[in-house]
Amino acid sequence: MTEQMTVRGTLKGHSGWVTQIATTPKYPDMILSASRDKSIIMWKLTRDETNYGIPQRSLKGHSHFVSDVVISSDGQFALSGAWDGTLRLWDLTTGLTTRRFVGHTKDVLSVAFSADNRQIVSGSRDKTIKLWNTLGVCKYTIQDEGHTEWVSCVRFSPNSSNPIIVSCGWDKMVKVWNLANCKLKTNHIGHTGYLNTVTVSPDGSLCASGGKDGQAMLWDLNEGKHLYTLDSGDVINALCFSPNRYWLCAATGPSIKIWDLEGKIIVDELRQEVISTNSKAEPPQCTSLAWSADGQTLFAGYTDNLIRVWQVTIGTR
């Protein structure tokens, strides 16, 4: 008996690429998605056969593509970043913006909350990483030994005993920063193309990075060294660890690959069936990934504006 993924349905509501998806253990029937349609949709998951969920509320305010969205650990707030150069903090009970964060001089590509929700980090096309408090005050701008190209992704480690930020950029570098003094801790060198994404494991012990070269590189955050590399065969747009299995999930071109990290083998490859009359039509690319908090459901956002939903099932392959 093996675990595999079974398609469960779709979420329709966006009119632009789905750039990010956020879930929270506090509200298992809600997810948020960010899009190039400049909005964030709050979904109510119905788990119906036809429609897996319905758009409950649209968070509007950004004047350009929304690139990233995360939910605070209490499930009350969302944080977004957009190509309008700003971050926004949203009250999810009212759907209103409670704070605007102004300071980046170019598109914001990535945002994150610290484990205690007291700190916010953002990465931008202005090549800087900024640390903010929740009142919208920029406390620090990381430029020393910083990225020399666009900062495509920033993430906090969930491990409070090793307070770090991990970032990656179009300079092919993965950088680990000491949160206490905002100084560079480690440069992870090895990628041969620009980077789109970095993700930290649930226990904070390792991170994975990916981008143009199609290699998912795994790094030990405690030792500061390269562990191993998994070849996805196509550009990696998003990566995420399963919250409860030793799996790494990669959005790679039009498909999703799931690796079992113990055996470094592919558990499953998820492709959506595209019924197309024009064989030259480019299949939609997978641009975002998020697991439900219980690790049973995978949400994936695409360039055809849909979110596709898979579930872990026991199969007899």
UniProtKB/Swiss-Prot annotation:
- What are the disulphide bonds in this sequence? none
Keyword Ribonucleoprotein listed? The answer is yes
WD repeat copies, ranges? 13-44, 61-91, 103-133, 146-178, 190-220, 231-260, 281-311
Q: Name one GO molecular function term.
A: translation regulator activity
- What superkingdom heads the lineage? Eukaryota
Q: What is this protein's function per UniProt?
A: Involved in the recruitment, assembly and/or regulation of a variety of signaling molecules. Interacts with a wide variety of proteins and plays a role in many cellular processes. Required for VANGL2 membrane localization, inhibits Wnt signaling and regulates cellular polarization and oriented cell division during gastrulation.
Q: What is this protein called?
A: Small ribosomal subunit protein RACK1
Tell me which species this is from: Oreochromis niloticus (Nile tilapia)
Cite the source lineage: Eukaryota, Metazoa, Chordata, Craniata, Vertebrata
